[in-house]
């Protein structure tokens, strides 16, 4: 598919109600799914599209083995999303977490409790219609520029809907630690964490039994 939004559109004919979107190769923890379910099962579109996302504390998503890219969230006073800014080089250091936008010439600190997006979104079926309507225009503009690597990202459509006043995205919070394998060295830590949660009874030995 041409990016995350196009991947969601591929399932359009199979979706008939509110739905969540995740990265298939990430571990989000149980809290995120609880708050997502609670929101989607009690909210629906009214005068605006009523969507949500689950944010994580930055310190619970970084790697000790190198830099990561994260979507840094800014929220409105009512807890809805104002913007997501992609910071492509975030690193830990002895005093905390910081990012650079100029190849390391200068660094800016980020508080560990900064909310970041890990691509856990909750939408109503209306999102599919909006994304589909915008896809042809996006393809016409971007395919000639970068035919092999252009991507139709979910946050692109979300940002457009917010700017047009069509949607509000409630920013939900999870304090669980997020796990993903950004670097080869991350894998043993993830394997150990999942094994520990299984031993504690949080997950069964055989998920598919």
Features from the language model and the residues they span:
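Short phosphate-binding loop-to-helix
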Residues: 1-17
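Loop/helix-junction capping segments adjacent to catalytic residues or to phosphate/diphosphate-binding pockets
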Residues: 5, 29-30, 181
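Short coil/turn segments at beta-strand junctions that form active-site/ligand-binding loops
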Residues: 17-18, 50, 167
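Short beta-strand-to-loop acidic/aromatic patch adjacent to the donor-nucleotide binding site
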Residues: 17-27
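Structural beta-sheet core signal
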Residues: 21, 53-54, 171
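Hydrophobic/aromatic residue at the end of a short beta strand that borders the catalytic acidic motif
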Residues: 28-29, 123
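Conserved core of the sugar-phosphate nucleotidyltransferase
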Residues: 30-118
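Conserved alpha/beta core of the MobA/IspD/sugar-nucleotide pyrophosphorylase nucleotidyltransferase superfamily
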Residues: 75-77, 84-209
């Amino acid at each position: 598919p041409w990016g995350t939004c196009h991947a969601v559109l591929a399932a359009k004919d199979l979706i008939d109600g509110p739905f969540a979107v995740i990265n298939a190769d990430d571990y989000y923890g149980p809290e995120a799914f609880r708050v997502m379910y609670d929101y989607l099962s009690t909210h629906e579109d009214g005068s605006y599209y009523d969507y949500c996302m689950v944010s994580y504390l930055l310190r619970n998503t970084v790697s000790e083995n190198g830099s990561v890219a994260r979507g840094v969230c800014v929220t409105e006073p009512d807890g809805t999303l104002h913007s997501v800014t992609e910071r492509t080089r975030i690193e830990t250091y002895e005093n905390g977490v910081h990012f650079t936008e100029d190849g390391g010439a200068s660094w800016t600190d980020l508080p560990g409790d900064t909310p970041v997006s890990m691509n856990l979104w909750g939408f109503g079926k209306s999102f599919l219609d909006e994304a589909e309507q915008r896809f042809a225009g996006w393809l016409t503009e971007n395919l000639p520029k970068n035919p092999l690597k252009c991507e139709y990202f979910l946050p692109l459509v979300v940002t457009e809907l917010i700017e047009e006043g069509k949607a509000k995205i409630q920013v939900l919070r999870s304090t669980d630690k997020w796990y993903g394998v950004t670097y080869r060295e991350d894998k043993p830590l993830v394997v150990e964490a999942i094994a520990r949660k299984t031993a504690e009874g949080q997950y069964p030995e055989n998920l598919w039994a």
